[in-house]
């Protein structure tokens, strides 16, 4: 598979994928099947409608080679959707789309899993999934001594710990689960006591994280 770009001459047609990347033409050859600028712009329009966060620059980088398996997977799903559900797909775009699907699926042997999101608050605040103190939590007394205690890592694997204070289950639905350790009961009824006997055992061969 080869990606061809050009910034010389007149632009083939007015489309943001070309204009925003300062290109006059863009095409891909997949096993001797030519995918034109118009076909790629058509695919971009559908992919961006399904994934609004992707812009023209990101899509061009994607065409040259996806950075991670999640990005690649979403792009392949778009190509499959076009082939299976798009009633407006021009017939001349069908074969290029098929060949692109066949070519891009091979990237799975090269891409790496996406690293954990740096937007996860618990991942940023907790070192090695250890409890950490917070100045306040809505629904608890302002003078309470509070800790956030992770009970699973970012991938959902349970975290074992040793705790000396009462734990309360957080109503948070976030992926990285945690409970709240407090020396005073909560003021809000939405927090309930959390008891997990397996989590109160120390890790073999390691020192427990004591609050």
From Swiss-Prot:
It is found in: Host cytoplasm. GO terms for molecular function: RNA binding. Its main location: host cell. GO terms for biological process: symbiont-mediated suppression of host innate immune response. Keywords: Host cytoplasm, Host-virus interaction, Inhibition of host innate immune response by virus, RNA-binding, Suppressor of RNA silencing, Viral immunoevasion. InterPro entries: Tenui_movmnt_prot, Tenui_NS3. It holds the Pfam family Tenui_NS3. Signal peptide: none annotated. One of its GO terms (cellular component) is host cell cytoplasm. It comes from the Viruses. This is Suppressor of RNA silencing p3. Acts as a suppressor of RNA-mediated gene silencing, also known as post-transcriptional gene silencing (PTGS), presumably through the binding of dsRNA. Belongs to the tenuiviruses p3 protein family. Gene3D superfamilies: Tenuivirus movement protein. The keyword RNA-binding applies. Homodimer.
């Amino acid at each position: 598979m080869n990606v061809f770009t050009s910034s010389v001459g007149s632009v083939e047609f007015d489309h943001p994928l070309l204009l925003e990347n300062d290109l006059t033409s863009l095409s891909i050859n997949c096993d001797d099947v030519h995918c034109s600028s118009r076909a790629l712009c058509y695919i971009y329009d559908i992919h961006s409608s399904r994934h609004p966060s992707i812009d023209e620059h990101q899509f061009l980088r994607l065409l040259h080679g996806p950075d991670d398996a999640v990005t690649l997977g979403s792009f392949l799903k778009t190509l499959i959707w076009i082939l299976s559900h798009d009633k407006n797909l021009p017939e001349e775009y069908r074969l290029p789309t098929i060949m692109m699907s066949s070519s891009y699926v091979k990237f799975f042997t090269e891409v790496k899993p996406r690293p954990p999101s740096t937007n996860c608050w618990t991942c940023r605040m907790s070192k090695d999934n250890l409890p950490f103190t917070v100045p306040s939590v809505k629904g608890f007394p302002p003078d309470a001594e509070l800790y956030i205690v992770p009970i699973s890592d970012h991938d959902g694997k349970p975290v074992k710990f040793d705790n000396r204070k009462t734990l309360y289950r957080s109503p948070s639905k976030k992926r990285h689960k945690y409970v709240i350790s407090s020396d005073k009961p909560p003021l809000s009824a939405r927090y309930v006591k959390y008891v997990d006997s397996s989590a109160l055992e120390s890790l073999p061969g390691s020192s427990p994280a004591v609050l």
